[in-house]
């Protein structure tokens, strides 16, 4: 009943640099298809801090995305991890926005969405006032997992496709990154998981505390002790 689309940025030069060509019209069309199919809540993800981005170019992206009237926006800080992502090794690091520019871009984003009818939730999400995500923070029921904010605290996340990550109370698991390996596992009737991590009791506690602070910016010590 809800879909999330990754957009990142609409600037053509930025898209070429990050090897992710995704015209605005394509995003516009799939969102219309989702609406026509009865999907009641649509989220779009944007990223600031990408190569060749400027405050001005990202403002243009925000203005254009606003016309899509999506129910939520998630605006993440770009994480440059070339030791994990081979494609990032091709990026010219001199083209990244400076840290102070990224802070200005974040401020621009907050000002833009909050002045256009959206509410800021947590560190990087912007839902409409009637969205259940905003209602959750008013009730103190907002949660966060490694993908962002959610109203479904404690629910297992099941990764299905290539590279997808799943997690439960005490584990993380990632599927094969190679399509052939993923298909081979499926054909054999196996889960296409190639690595995982089991959390210790101490790590589970630390995770709960961190996520609670990131979600509600406060900590109920009694509740932590009960958990």
For every predicted segment, state its role.
Residues 1-227:
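C-terminal scaffold of the Radical SAM
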């Amino acid at each position: 009943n809800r879909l999330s689309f990754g957009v990142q940025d609409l600037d053509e030069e930025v898209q070429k640099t990050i090897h992710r060509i995704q015209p605005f019209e394509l995003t516009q069309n799939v969102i219309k298809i989702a609406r026509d199919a009865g999907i009641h809540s649509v989220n779009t993800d944007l990223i600031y801090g990408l190569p060749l981005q400027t405050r001005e170019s990202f403002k243009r992206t925000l203005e254009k995305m606003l016309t899509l009237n999506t129910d939520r926006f998630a605006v993440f800080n770009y994480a440059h991890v070339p030791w994990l992502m081979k494609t990032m090794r091709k990026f010219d690091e001199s083209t990244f926005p400076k840290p102070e520019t990224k802070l200005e871009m974040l401020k621009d984003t907050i000002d833009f969405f909050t002045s256009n009818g959206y509410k800021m939730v947590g560190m990087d999400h912007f839902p409409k006032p009637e969205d259940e995500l905003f209602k959750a923070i008013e009730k103190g029921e907002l949660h966060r997992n490694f993908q962002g904010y959610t109203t479904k605290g404690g629910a297992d996340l099941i990764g299905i496709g290539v590279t997808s990550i799943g997690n439960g109370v005490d584990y993380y698991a990632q599927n094969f990154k190679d399509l052939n390996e993923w298909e081979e596992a499926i054909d054999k009737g196996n889960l296409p998981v190639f690595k995982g991590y089991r959390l210790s009791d101490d790590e589970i506690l630390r995770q709960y505390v961190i996520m609670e602070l990131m979600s509600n910016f406060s900590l109920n010590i009694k509740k932590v002790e009960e958990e």
